[in-house]
Structure formats: C-alpha cells, structure tokens
A protein has these predicted regions:
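A short, flexible helix-boundary coil/loop motif
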Residues: 144-151
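Helix-centered, glycine/charged polyanion-binding patches within enzymatic domains
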Residues: 43-44, 49-128
C-alpha cells in the first residue's frame, strides 16, 4: 500500500468477502504469494496479469485451474475485426468482472475508512492492521444482510 509494502488478498468470487490477507514487502512479486492466498476449497482461481505463470510454480496446487488476465499491451494489440480476437477480448472482460470483486475491499478501506496511506511500523504490525481493516470491510459489505436478518 505505502512505503514499500503490499497487501495480497484472497477473496470469494461470489460474495467478494476477503478470506486471506498476506502482507509482504514491496519487492515480493504477486505470483510468489498466489498459491498461499487460496483457502483450499477452490477449484478455479482468477488473477490479474501479475499472476502469469503461477500454474508452473513448484508450490502450485494441481487441482486448481488458474484464469490469469492477459497483459494490457497484448490485449490492446487484439484486432476487433477477427472473430477469434473478439472472443478472447470477451473472455478478458469476464475475467475482469470477477477480479473487480477482489478490488472492492480495497475501495472500502481507502474510501470509506480513509486508509489511503499507512505509516510503516513494521511488517507484522502493518499486516495486523490490514487484517483488521479487511475484517471490518467484510462486515461493512454484509451489513445490510446482517441487519435484515436481525428483524
């Protein structure tokens, strides 16, 4: 998020709720954390272009199918006139719609809670704060369902 730290999250594709949070230093690539973001029940995982090649890693789970986004430059190079390229572009739009669910908790933390920048207090302390913030974002996202169940 800020000062060379990244928050990697695993979220449910249907509900958008965060189930896994990993805090790493800024120089750790996304693909390194990819398989640790899975909770074990997934058969399909969707990631952005930073996760390309994840299925080839030694820690990759064999029973998980990864759908990883195309690099932006390759997507721009697709020709809309060719039927095959148009189908590939449509598939990329579907993947982007699923990935948007993962980005929504970041929006809740930054816009609704105001945590755009964080003071770096150490990896463990900042990761603990991220875990708390994502738990609160989960509560915020299911607030209407919880209130409806109340009465």
């Amino acid at each position: 998020m800020y000062f060379g730290m990244k928050a990697h999250i695993g979220a449910d594709a249907e509900s958008g709720l965060v189930h896994t949070v990993r805090g790493t230093s800024g120089n750790v690539h996304d693909v390194v954390q990819g398989n640790s973001l899975l909770h074990g029940q997934e058969s399909v995982a969707v990631g952005d272009a930073g996760y390309q090649g994840i299925e080839k890693r030694p820690d990759a789970k064999a029973d998980v199918i990864w759908y990883v986004a195309m690099r932006p430059g390759k997507r721009r190079a697709l020709s809309k006139e060719h039927a095959a390229d148009a189908m590939i572009d449509q598939a990329e739009k579907l993947k982007a719609g699923i990935r948007a669910k993962v980005e929504h908790p970041f929006r809740v933390i930054k816009r609704q809670f105001g945590f755009v920048k964080m003071r770096y207090r150490g990896l463990k302390k900042n990761t603990a704060q991220h875990v708390t913030l994502f738990a609160l974002s989960n509560l915020s996202m299911v607030r209407s369902k919880l209130m409806g169940a109340q009465g």
